Amino acid sequence: MKKNLCLLLVCLLSAAAPLQAQDMQQAQKLIDQAQKYLYNNPKQASYYAAQASALFPEDEPSEVRAQAMILYCQAEQLLGNFDLSIKNLYDTQKYIHPTNKKQMAQLCSLMGRVYSKLGDYNKAIELNDKATSIFKSIGDSTSVAGCYNKRGVMHHFMSEFTVAERFFQRALAINRAQRNLKEIATNLNNLCLYRGNTCLLYTSPSPRD
């Protein structure tokens, strides 16, 4: 009897392992799809990210689940669902491993962006500063530049145009050093709103973050 129970346990464990691997592969495929559609179809990206997140248990930390949830929140904020996005970002924190500094910084950066959309600029700047510090500590210059650009956008909407320009210039300097053409274009677009220290208020488009 004891031998039969051991055999049954081995069979169950053997059956569970491939299923877990299949779920992980499926989650990664869904995450890839979410990233693909994020900017041109955020509604579809939100769907894929939510499906990926649902593959994981609610009570277990998982960096892959955290990645899916961050994508979901990013898609929802692009859709204008800021309250839903910020709620889920807070829920995401428990799935991030304490040693994964990059993922925590990504979370803080996105939270800062959403708080900015909600008009809470003090909280937005606090989170942006935290994200910037973490990215600096791990040597991720590209993400530091991204934080500077987002910070510039925040100050633009606070009508602090001189400060905004300074952060856009910092982002541009990093992106030029790395020859990141896409982000250079974004920085230059934002800087085109300015002439020296004077904001071109007439018919100027909003800066991009």
Outline where the language-model segments fall.
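N-terminal leader/linker segments that initiate helical-solenoid repeat arrays
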Residues: L19-I70
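Conserved alpha-helical positions within TPR/SEL1-like repeat arrays
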Residues: I31, L38, Q67-L78, Q106-K117, ...
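Eukaryotic all-alpha helical interaction scaffolds
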Residues: A49, F56-P57, Y95-H97, Y115, ...
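Short coil/turn linkers that connect adjacent helices within long alpha-helical scaffolds
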Residues: E58-P61, H97-N100, S137-D140, R176-N180
